[in-house]
Amino acid sequence: FAAVSVDCSEYPKPACMSEYRPLCGSDNKTYVNKCNFCNAVVESNGTLTLSHFGKC
C-alpha cells in the first residue's frame, strides 16, 4: 500500500487551466485537475486529502 499524495506547495493559484486530469478527494468529490484540488486543499486548511487519482 503506497500513500497517494499531490504536492500543493505552490498553491493557491487564482486561476486554473481547464485540463481534465481528475482526482478524487477525501470528501468523495471529483476534482477536474490538480489545480482545482490543491485550491480546495488550501481552503480546507489541509483537512482535504487525495483519495486516489481518477474520478470518485
Curated annotation (Swiss-Prot):
Q: From the Swiss-Prot or TrEMBL record, what is one GO molecular function term?
A: serine-type endopeptidase inhibitor activity
Superkingdom classification of source: Eukaryota
Q: Where is this site: Reactive bond 3?
A: 18-19
The record's InterPro entries line, in alphabetical order, gives: Bifunctional_prot_inhibitor, Kazal_dom, Kazal_dom_sf, Prot_inh_Kazal-m
The record, for Pfam families, names:
Kazal_1 (PF00050)
Nuclease among keywords: no
Where in this chain does the record put each Kazal-like domain?
6-56
**Compartmental location:** Secreted
Q: Which GO terms describe its cellular component?
A: extracellular region
Q: Membrane spanning segments where?
A: none
Family annotation (SMART domains): KAZAL
UniProt keywords, alphabetically: Disulfide bond, Glycoprotein, Protease inhibitor, Repeat, Secreted, Serine protease inhibitor
Among PROSITE patterns, the record links this protein to:
KAZAL_1 (PS00282), KAZAL_2 (PS51465)
Q: Which residues are glycosylated?
A: 45
Keyword match Flavoprotein: no
The signal peptide here is none
Main subcellular localization, coarse class? secreted
Query: Which Cys-Cys disulphide bridges does the record give?
Result: 8-38, 16-35, 24-56
The domain section of the record reads: Avian ovomucoid consists of three homologous, tandem Kazal family inhibitory domains.
Protein name per its UniProtKB record: Ovomucoid
Q: Which organism is it from?
A: Colinus virginianus (Northern bobwhite)
